[in-house]
Amino acid sequence: MSKLHEYLKSQESLITSSVEGKTLIDFINRNAEEYADYPALNTPANSEYSAWDSMSWSEYRDAAKNLASGLIDLGLSPGDTAFIMSNNTKEHNISDLGIVYCGATPSTLYKQLKYNQIEYVANLMQAKVAIVGDLELFEEVNKAKKDCINLQAIVLI
């Protein structure tokens, strides 16, 4: 056992007591209040990764809550499920958190899936909303939508 592992094991009860009964939303809200202007997400500003765009904790929370408001208007409710098909971008992270703010469960689907595979997974998870990162993915999910029992909306980010 490494020294780090031993140390973490010795701190287990302290760590557990500090997070017990709290949710992800509790911690996002705390960070947005206590660390409002600190970076929460960093995204490459160019393909060479020589510059980065940052989004602060308060901007991240506000963007997720704004998306959640729209998702609720589309019918997403606590206990529902939604999926995201997108590159690993800040919009993907905002979408994931926005779904959580609705009280729904997010899932990420591989971008390489074709419409029949999307249909299968969407029906299996009873997805109510799909969030996609580009027009090509929108078209693929839209083909699957007609045979998806619960899928009510596709959101293009």
Give the label of every model feature segment.
Residues 101-157:
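Structural core segment of the AMP-binding/adenylate-forming
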Residues 24, 56-57, 115:
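Structural motif detector for alpha-helix initiation sites
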